[in-house]
């Protein structure tokens, strides 16, 4: 069974911090991007598509607070979709899933490789989140805004 926390420890020379349970890592002692990518791929027990960002990208996300005007409620989760690569296609936003009736997923805006939205806690939501890949034409991974905030906290903490 794959355990991201164990993988983070195995990549100790890079001072990798595992954030959450889905394999989101903060690398606090980076070298070259290609060197880290190769080291990570060698340690993974399966094939994976990796998306690497500079920490400054997440610091700018937090500073810009894309959810500031939106009211929060316990049944609505704010998320960031991270696209596997920048896309040239412009998507007319906002988009809701399902398109009719009460929305379960609402994609509000996009900026570079980041997509911002909200979803309601419902059994059908996961299927609608999968539509983001189709909407933008590239694979996307979804992270709760709380995960982004946790990444920023790690980035703001001095390395060991």
PLM regions: where:
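Surface-exposed, charge/polar-rich loops and edge strands
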Residues: 1-160
């Amino acid at each position: 069974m794959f355990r991201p926390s164990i993988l983070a420890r195995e990549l100790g020379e890079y001072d990798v911090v595992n954030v959450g349970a889905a394999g989101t890592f903060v690398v606090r002692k980076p070298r070259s991007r290609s060197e880290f990518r190769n080291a990570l791929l060698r340690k993974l027990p399966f094939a994976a598509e990796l998306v690497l960002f500079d920490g400054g990208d997440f610091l700018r996300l937090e500073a810009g607070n894309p959810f500031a005007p939106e009211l929060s409620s316990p049944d609505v989760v704010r998320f960031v979709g991270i696209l596997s690569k920048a896309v040239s296609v412009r998507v007319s936003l906002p988009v809701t899933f399902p398109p009719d009736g009460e929305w379960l997923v609402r994609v509000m805006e996009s900026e570079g490789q980041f997509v911002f939205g909200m979803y309601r806690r419902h059994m059908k939501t996961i299927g609608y989140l999968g539509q983001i890949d189709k909407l933008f034409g590239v694979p996307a991974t979804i992270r709760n805004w709380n995960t982004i905030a946790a990444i920023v906290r790690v980035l703001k903490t001095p390395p060991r």
